[in-house]
Regions:
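CBM-like carbohydrate-recognition segments
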Residues: 25-103, 118, 122-125, 130, ...
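Extended ligand-binding clefts on enzyme/binding-domain cores
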Residues: 189, 219-334, 341-352, 364-402, ...
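Extended ligand-binding groove/face enriched in aromatic
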Residues: 125-129, 136-271, 278-280, 387
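Bacterial N-terminal signal peptides
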Residues: 9-19
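Boundary at the C-terminal end of the N-terminal hydrophobic targeting segment
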Residues: 21-23
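Bacterial N-terminal signal peptides that target proteins for export
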Residues: 1-9
């Protein structure tokens, strides 16, 4: 009986279909507003809610808090060491997924502070304070051991005896931010290490520009704008000493003079003093460190500083260039001006943060760039998996003078470079959403400017 009913239904449907189709009006330019058809976006489109952004930050926090334990153990007995007066060469950090003293974690500490301020949730701030306090409590006993034995080992050895800007710059900036945010721990010895290394030990060109001796002698790394300059500017804010601001502006302008392409509006990754020509590979994350430097220096640079307008002009030129290379998915490419290179998450997050911050501080045109920020954040959010890991991040990268080097850099969820930028971006997007209104106007995202 059921089979007969199904057959009858099928026959009736077959006869009814032409009549139904004939009764429907055809979809064409006359009968339908085609411009209102829903596009098939590869990335969520539109301004997210504060709640949606907060959920992404929550996943990242929950993951990182679980996989970055803040304690010191004996590497042989695996027992926790609580009395730091009894430290010896066997003391190491309890193993986690990420290093507590890397430059990437300096960015993460700053990102946690920003997320705490934006969301009002103390747990983010506590994350940074707990770990920075641990580093600070290790500093004095470690220095005492090093004085007695220069070959002594310590989990914070490279922080107190840096070999490169990577070892101290981003961490130093985070230490100052934490202190300015109310941290009670004595970070003085850590800041002294930063002052000494950046101020007198890091290699420089003849005009004082921060440089490295690799991969070629006297090489400028765009990364070093961030590894050295924001820390110096933060020390200026902390101490009130103008010399730190003067040096920060000097570094920005001297890096930019050599490495910024004004026609493209973006920076090359490396510049070698001894080369007759300077190959331009516009690596995305290095450009991220540069634009982040510009924003972070402006945040603390006195309004009356004579170099402020030049830094502001450089920021606007760079943001304009970066915006022109954003992919339709919301991401930016590994090599900015080579759209056949892969889409990269950490750089996209840094741009989302830097542009949102620049809008919130009034440095750039809010209506012109806010939609790009929304698209960028929506793209980044798709790369935070259910566990809270950030996908699509390029691993640590040196410097190359051929395209294959950049095209084929691996990506990995354990590339630590993605986490701080995602926290910073989410925090600043929340701040933007709290102060600005967005609408869909004729299908496109627009910031509402009318009163």
């Amino acid at each position: 009986m059921n089979r007969k009913n199904h057959l009858l239904t099928a026959i009736l449907f077959a006869f009814a279909l032409p009549a139904t189709a004939a009764a429907q009006a055809p979809v064409n330019d006359v009968t339908a507003p085609l411009h209102l058809m829903k596009p098939d976006y590869p990335t969520p489109y539109g301004a997210p809610s504060v709640a949606d952004v907060s959920k992404v930050l929550d996943r990242v926090f929950t993951y990182l808090d679980a996989v970055t334990p803040a304690k010191v153990i004996d590497k042989n007995t695996r027992q926790e060491i609580r009395d730091f007066s009894k430290l010896d060469d066997n003391a190491v950090f309890a193993q986690g997924d990420y290093r507590l003293t890397s430059y990437e974690w300096g960015v993460t500490y700053a990102g946690m502070l920003a997320a705490g301020a934006a969301t009002g949730e103390q747990r983010y701030i506590d994350y940074t304070n707990k770990r920075v306090t641990l580093l600070a409590e290790l500093a004095k006993p470690t220095l005492a051991r090093l004085k007695a034995n220069p070959n002594a080992q310590s989990p914070i050895l490279r922080t107190l005896r840096p070999h490169a800007l990577d070892d101290i710059g981003a961490l130093c900036a985070a230490f100052v931010k934490a202190r300015r945010n109310g941290l009670q721990a004595d970070v003085g010895p850590l800041l002294d290490s930063c002052r000494t290394f950046i101020g007198s030990k890091e290699h420089r060109l003849a005009d004082g520009t921060l440089a490295r001796l690799r991969p070629q002698p006297d090489t400028l790394w765009l990364d070093d704008m961030f590894m050295g300059v924001p820390a110096w500017a933060q020390l200026g804010k902390l101490t009130g000493e103008r010399k730190y601001f003067d040096e920060s502006v000097k570094q920005i302008l001297q890096f930019s003079q050599r490495m910024f392409n004004p026609q493209k509006g973006i920076y090359m990754h490396g510049w070698v003093q001894g080369m007759d020509v300077h190959p331009e590979f516009h690596w995305a994350r290095a450009n991220g460190w540069a634009v982040m430097t510009l924003v972070e220096v402006l945040d603390v640079l006195p309004e009356d500083h004579p170099g402020r307008e030049a830094v502001l002009k450089q920021l606007r030129a760079h943001v304009k260039g970066l915006a022109s290379y954003q992919d339709g998915t919301g991401f930016w490419h590994q090599l900015l001006d080579r759209p056949d290179s892969y889409l990269e998450t950490s750089a996209t997050a840094i741009y989302a943060y830097s542009m949102a911050r620049a809008i919130n501080k009034g440095y750039i045109d809010r209506a012109a760039y806010a939609p790009a920020v929304m698209l960028a954040w929506n793209a980044v959010a798709t790369k935070v998996n259910a566990k809270g890991q950030v996908e699509g991040t390029c691993v640590g990268t040196g410097m190359g003078f051929d395209p294959a080097f950049y095209y084929y850099r691996p990506i990995n969820v354990f590339a630590a470079h993605g986490y701080g930028p995602v926290l910073l971006a989410g925090a600043e997007v929340i701040n933007l959403l709290k102060t600005q209104k967005f609408e869909i106007n004729d299908s496109s995202v627009q910031l509402v400017t009318r009163k």
